[in-house]
Amino acid sequence: MPVNSTAVSWTSVTYITVEILIGLCAIVGNVLVIWVVKLNPSLQTTTFYFIVSLALADIAVGVLVMPLAIVISLGVTIHFYSCLFMTCLMLIFTHASIMSLLAIAVDRYLRVKLTVRYRRVTTQRRIWLALGLCWLVSFLVGLTPMFGWNMKLSSADENLTFLPCRFRSVMRMDYMVYFSFFLWILVPLVVMCAIYFDIFYIIRNRLSQSFSGSRETGAFYGREFKTAKSLLLVLFLFALCWLPLSIINCILYFDGQVPQTVLYLGILLSHANSMMNPIVYAYKIKKFKETYLLILKACVMCQPSKSMDPSTEQTSE
């Protein structure tokens, strides 16, 4: 979309300001998430390892993606492949988030489906393999345009390799719509919705059976129900934040027109998702809220770190 290169509009100034604020909140919030998991041995379980992976992706969004998005919004003239690599980095961490969410959903499904065998199935080695696979897939999907699926035009004029860096100047929209969105965002979202539907179905059946069984079994599935609701909310917020921008990309691909302000709002909403998860954890997971408060108290009151030792309260894996 044409943008005046001689001056930065108020829309751009507002966009950049909000990007910076969102980035700072995302970094601080997700560093706290990792800190909480580190402080609480009861949270150092399979699910929370994947939550840490999600937090790392969100930190990367704040540290790398948002500054790069600002550079791209300004249309700075750089080499084609430098611009392309910047846009690819932005995609990598989006897919790292969706892969982490998928891993979390699969883990919760195994937790309620294979209650007895769960610990034997989710070994430390398999957890690390799953984490590695999540990030490997994210890098492969995000870097695909670097291997040829891009807007590069063959030309003998070397000057044409430098251009104002804009997302659509280097990134092909058929890649964004069919490969990135349909295949690697929409399909995993549908799969995760099906997984959570099955999780709630299993929990409901087990809870109904627990009335005639042990109280311990009922308590276990009650905790699993609360945990599943919290993680489903995280998934819902991801879909709510990312689908508008994906729909905008579809409109642009099919030659539709989208006002620059609407495009900025879509980008900001997608980036805002990176700062939402820490808030959800604090609101829905008691152990997170307690440790957030302990960390805040330690920072404000300058108390020694030993005062932040977590309580021995049990937490669902």
Swiss-Prot record:
Name the PROSITE patterns for this protein: G_PROTEIN_RECEP_F1_1 (PS00237), G_PROTEIN_RECEP_F1_2 (PS50262)
Task: Give the location in the cell.
Answer: Cell membrane
Q: How does it sit in the membrane?
A: Multi-pass membrane protein
Which tissues does the record link to its expression? Most abundant in lung, spleen and pineal gland. Moderate expression in brain, kidney and testis.
A single Gene Ontology CC annotation of this entry is:
dendrite
Q: What SMART domains does its record include?
A: 7TM_GPCR_Srsx
Q: Membrane side Extracellular: which residues?
A: 1-14, 73-84, 149-176, 255-260
- Where in the chain are disulfide-linked cysteines found? C83-C165
**GO MF annotation list:** G protein-coupled adenosine receptor activity
Q: Please name the Pfam families in this protein's record.
A: 7tm_1 (PF00001)
Transmembrane regions: 15-37, 49-72, 85-106, 127-148, 177-197, 231-254, 261-283
Q: How is it modified after translation?
A: Phosphorylation on Thr-315 and Ser-316 may be crucial for rapid desensitization. Phosphorylation on Thr-315 may be necessary for phosphorylation on Ser-316 to occur.
Q: Its family?
A: Belongs to the G-protein coupled receptor 1 family.
> By what name is this protein known?
Adenosine receptor A3
Q: What is the lineage of its organism?
A: Eukaryota, Metazoa, Chordata, Craniata, Vertebrata
